[in-house]
Design a protein with these regions (language model features):
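C-terminal accessory subdomain/extension
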Residues: 271-401
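Short, acidic/turn-prone active-site loops that include or flank metal/cofactor-
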Residues: 70, 88-93, 109-113, 133-135, ...
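A structural signal for short, hydrophobic beta-strand segments that form beta-sheets
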Residues: 86, 266, 323-324
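A charged N-terminal "starter" segment
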Residues: 1-104, 118, 126, 165, ...
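Residue-level signal for inorganic ion chemistry
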Residues: 20, 75, 169, 266, ...
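C-terminal helical cap(s) of enzyme catalytic domains, especially alpha/beta-barrels
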Residues: 73-79, 248-256, 370
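Active-site loop/helix belt of alpha/beta enzymes
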Residues: 8-9, 42-59, 114, 118-128, ...
Length: 401
């Protein structure tokens, strides 16, 4: 079967699988002998989980991590055979699906464990679980910081329930990507609690097979964090760095290549005369003859409306073009006065070019993080997968549906 290589050049996201491979290898080199669990939740941060998981599997990933059951089933239906961990909530009623497709669930409280145990027994099997402990994130997990002994007692009780097979232990750092002194201390406290939990479970006869606490910042900054744990059982769990972005402005490594480039095309070019205005609210009025290009993309595709009125920078013909007026749902306008040879159909780079914005600069301009910018690219935007500069596949959710 030939890969789908056809897509409408309206707005699309180019996914550089060579960059993805390079990023994985860079993390692997830093992690040393630690196995890697590649985080592919949220459709691989907007990049396309099926294709990204395929690359990670080829490069030697040991696990894949997702957020929900649907994401796990998508991977299984794409013939993905790597172990899959659901980091978030799963309804116990879906225990049969977890068993059938060999998907590992997070177990994060005794009531949740009991419900999952009952459902697993009714399904006639055992659900594999990784215990999630809350060392300071404040989300799901046995609450070690509130009452360590009580939380460990509940975790041990969960391990003894019929229908459950405890195979792992994990937690999540809340400020590992922050270099403020108090946050460095807080991260160390989280790690110490996690180590303490591991040894408490081991002493009770429930030593986890797999232990993981390192996120992107953790694996890069602290390759020594398996210290205090059984190193042969440890695993790192990188996320955002696999897709080419640093965890935060404070924690930067400068060795990862952004994987996604968001592109669109020019749909019309016109010259606006002094006094003429553009877009909703008439927020832009020309003070001099201005060449304006309309682009066939907008906030419905994931280009933030906060980049209206000159905040956003688009690249056309290698030149920086500021956004004019407000970004619309499906269209936007940019100033192309310095590009006299521009034509309808010309390519425009929304982010990821040499002079355009990046997901990180957009995040700064819109008071968010690169994660949200990447995840915000909507499903009406085809993902175009490239290897060695050539299209190897296209994923178009609208046409597939």
């Amino acid at each position: 079967i030939m890969p789908n290589q056809v897509f409408e050049k309206h707005v699309w996201a180019e996914i550089d699988l060579d960059a993805l491979r390079q990023n994985f290898r860079a993390v692997k080199q830093r992690a040393g002998e630690l196995p890697l669990c590649a985080v592919v939740k949220a459709d691989s941060y907007g990049h396309g989980a099926v294709q990204c998981a395929r690359v990670f599997a080829q490069e030697g990933a040991s696990w894949l991590a997702v957020s929900c059951l649907a994401e796990a089933l998508q991977l299984r239906r794409s013939s993905q055979t790597l172990p899959i961990l659901i980091l978030g909530h799963v309804q116990p009623t879906y225990a049969a699906a977890l068993i059938r497709d060999d998907i590992t669930a997070a177990c994060y409280s005794l009531p949740q464990a009991k419900a999952l145990s009952e459902a697993a027994q009714a399904a006639g099997g055992r659900v594999k679980v990784h215990l999630a402990v809350d060392t300071g994130m404040g989300r799901i997990g046995f609450a070690l910081r509130t009452d360590f002994d009580a939380a460990i007692a509940e975790a041990i009780a969960a391990c003894t329930l019929p229908g459950l097979e405890m195979t792992g232990l994990f937690q999540h750092f809340s400020v590992a990507d922050d270099t403020a002194e108090e946050n460095i201390v807080y991260t160390a406290e989280q790690h110490a609690l996690f180590v303490r939990a591991f040894h408490a479970l081991k002493a009770a006869g429930h030593e986890p097979q797999t232990v993981h606490c390192d996120n992107s910042a953790g694996v890069m900054l602290h390759p020594d964090w398996p210290e205090g744990l059984a190193r042969e059982r440890c695993m790192a769990r990188p996320g955002i760095i696999l897709y080419g972005y640093d965890p935060s402005d404070e924690v930067r490594f400068g060795q990862f290549r952004p994987v996604m480039t968001l592109k669109t095309v020019v749909s019309m070019v016109k010259e606006m005369q002094p006094g003429q205005s553009a877009s909703y609210g008439r927020r832009f009025t020309a003070e001099k003859p201005t060449l304006v290009a309309t682009l066939c993309t907008g906030y419905a595709d994931g280009y933030p409306r906060q980049l209206s009125c000159g905040k956003g920078i688009v690249e056309i013909h290698g030149k920086a073009c500021p956004v004019l007026g407000r970004v619309c749902m499906d269209q936007m306008m940019v100033d192309v006065t310095g590009i006299p040879d521009i034509r309808e159909g010309d390519e425009a780079i929304l982010w990821g070019g040499s002079v355009s914005d990046t997901a990180e600069t957009i995040a700064r301009k819109t008071d968010t993080i690169s994660y949200e910018v990447l995840c915000g690219v909507s499903r009406r935007v085809p993902r175009v997968y490239l290897e060695h500069g050539k299209i190897v596949d296209v994923e178009d959710w609208i046409l597939k549906a």
